[in-house]
Amino acid sequence: MGRSLKKGPFIADSLLKKVEKQNTENDKSVIKTWSRSSTILPVMIGHTIAVHNGKAHIPVFITEQMIGHKLGEFAPTRTYRGHLRDKKGAR
């Protein structure tokens, strides 16, 4: 279920300030953030944002198709190592 339209999308204030500052300076350096719940806005297109996954920061390059999604969707928190194989002697 989505967020109410009258409330608007959530974005961390500190993240929005950093993005707007880089837009005014034409700077495209990597922005580190722990705010996985922030919504991707059109202002962020072209920026690389390093999203924390609980262990490390994963760089995410923002494109037009990502608008409206959350930053955490692009930084997986769990590693999938495949299903365990059956042991030969377990019959």
Swiss-Prot record:
Top-rank taxon: Bacteria
Which HAMAP family does the record associate with it?
Answer: Ribosomal_uS19 (MF_00531)
Q: Which GO terms describe its biological process?
A: ribosomal small subunit assembly; translation
Q: What function is annotated for this protein?
A: Protein S19 forms a complex with S13 that binds strongly to the 16S ribosomal RNA.
Q: Which family does it belong to?
A: Belongs to the universal ribosomal protein uS19 family.
Q: Which GO terms describe its molecular function?
A: rRNA binding; structural constituent of ribosome
Q: Which UniProt keywords apply?
A: Ribonucleoprotein, Ribosomal protein, RNA-binding, rRNA-binding
What residue ranges are annotated as transmembrane?
none
The record's annotation in InterPro entries points to:
Ribosomal_uS19, Ribosomal_uS19_bac-type, Ribosomal_uS19_CS, Ribosomal_uS19_SF
Q: What is this protein called?
A: Small ribosomal subunit protein uS19
Q: Which organism is the protein's source?
A: Prochlorococcus marinus (strain MIT 9515)
Disulfide-bonded cysteine pairs: these are none
Gene of origin? rpsS
